[in-house]
Amino acid sequence: MAACGAEERQRTGRLSALSVYRRAAGPGRLERRRRGTPLPAGGKRTKARLRRGAAGGGGPERAAPPQGAAVSDRVERAGSSEAKQGDLKTNPSGPPAKAPAGNLETKSPGGPLTTSVGPRAKAPAGSPEAKPPGDPATSPGGGGVPGLLRRLGRLEDSRRRAAELFRWLVAPAAPEEFARQHWERAPLLVQRGDPGYYAGLFSTADFDAILRSGDVHFGTHLDVTSYAEGVRETHNPVGRALPAVVWDFYQNGCSLRLLSPQAFSTTVWHFLSILQEHFGSMAGANTYLTPPGTQGFAPHYDDIEAFVLQLEGKKHWRVYGPRTSSEALPQFSSANLTQAELGEPLLEVVLEAGDLLYFPRGFIHQADCLPDAHSLHITVSSYQRNSWGDFLEKLLPAALQMALEEDLEYRQGLPMDCLGYMGVANSDAVDARRTAFVEKVQHLIKKLVDYAPIDAAMDQRAKSFLHDCLPPVLTQSEKQLSVYGFPARWQDGGPRNVDIQITKDTEVRLLHHGVVRLCNEEAGVMLYYTTENSRVYHKEEPKYLEIDPEYTDSIEFLLSSYPNHVSVDTLPCDALEDKISLATLLFEKGILTTKKPLVQV
């Protein structure tokens, strides 16, 4: 508040910090609208600078946490737009013009790389097409997304739950078609004409409730952003994000990005915890709330596969293909780009509530709000650093280490005179010694494949994935049949129902298919698991049990038997005592469930 003089500070000394901000910055956007006076250009940025105590711009973009943003500056960014009948065109100098109500306008060059899927045609009542078998989106029960998740919970196999949830996500496009034509290749646009499709997943009411009841802090959980006149700024103050401050930022034209909503919303947590099993890679999310007629982010591309779910209002999107082959499927997100660096959009569309837009990593995108509606969307992201190259980064050093230990040829010395004929300065020289040297390197590289511990490297990648994972959300039945529903309690002055009575006849199975991973490590055999993970990304260290090698066959037996139950007596351990001990240990960690509730003695 350096802008306030001593007299002003004395006059406002008893006012709240928010009142001081308002006095320093002048009336807010809403008050100006009531007075009928225009909002001065750049007003919201001046106010935001006062809040964060900085005189200049927003500074470098803060890296968002991997779980929430496997989406760093993801999913918005725009120049202004002007919507006309039959097309959406860009007007870089003025605010967005109003689009015709209810009109979903798409601009696309066509061709095989961009597909727009309209709403599912209504099938005749009673026909097989009316309710495809196994399609939870069309099964009876309603209840929006929470109802969908409950119905998925009736499926015994967690892999089927994940597959059916993904089918619902991209419907009416078929998952097989999506994998063949779009995944890592091209955007997919689904215009459903169904504003209630995502009902119950997340809403502005949820956003407000989180601000009021959650421990939300600027920068850690919430970003306040703007993008105007080619300038992208972050306006985060220090400290807790209180509703009065946050909503005043919004009133003054700033976008709000809630990082990792799964840490606050049980429904989003449940949604992502199922979906991550489909991808076999961490599934993260951010939510974006944007005021009418504004945008919060500059054009850019990301290092994740992005699924944009339009929850409320509408938003104008432009998506551009990678500019060069090196930008296709990038390892890292780009810096903010300028409008001058962009070509013609591959896809231009207004998303309305219930619509879906998918685009692969490396596809540049930007989005702005039309003046007649706010926008709330959630971006679900996955496949960050999950490429062949990322796998080889871990595999090849291990292969080389094994080759050095086991093969004399890798330990033999280099030729004494190789410095004289190798190197860039000698690259054009015609020399038989150079030819022999290159051939030797090629031979050793090819031979390295024989030492590559491919399965062990994949186990380590799976271990990393399990650390990234959200903990599973249990159905009511799973709770009753697991340690989480075990009736141990304090009663009549002492603990009751404490003993876990697992016998040789108890039938058990893994909680979910991907809940554990066996890894052979130098320290021993480790069983990594997800049931004790945090909803906050990497808040806890990886969870594992050190397993006696004689138990590995039993773990593999449980993995291969899923989703079927097996009796404890069938576990391939030498002694019955070992079978019961292992089953009890896994039950206590929430890894195993029983077919029937355990009987209390």
UniProtKB/Swiss-Prot annotation:
One of its GO terms (cellular component) is nucleoplasm. PROSITE patterns: JMJC. The keyword Transcription regulation applies. Its cofactor is Fe(2+). GO terms for molecular function: 2-oxoglutarate-dependent dioxygenase activity; histone H3K36 demethylase activity; histone H3K36me/H3K36me2 demethylase activity; histone H3K4 demethylase activity; histone H3K4me/H3K4me2/H3K4me3 demethylase activity; iron ion binding; peptidyl-histidine dioxygenase activity; protein demethylase activity. Keywords: Chromatin regulator, Dioxygenase, Iron, Metal-binding, Nucleus, Oxidoreductase, Repressor, Transcription, Transcription regulation. Residues 254-399 form the JmjC domain. Residues 1-149 are annotated as: Disordered. Oxygenase that can act as both a histone lysine demethylase and a ribosomal histidine hydroxylase. Specifically demethylates 'Lys-4' (H3K4me) and 'Lys-36' (H3K36me) of histone H3, thereby playing a central role in histone code. Preferentially demethylates trimethylated H3 'Lys-4' (H3K4me3) and monomethylated H3 'Lys-4' (H3K4me1) residues, while it has weaker activity for dimethylated H3 'Lys-36' (H3K36me2). Also catalyzes demethylation of non-histone proteins. Also catalyzes the hydroxylation of 60S ribosomal protein L8 on 'His-216', thereby playing a role in ribosome biogenesis. Belongs to the ROX family. NO66 subfamily. This is Ribosomal oxygenase 1.
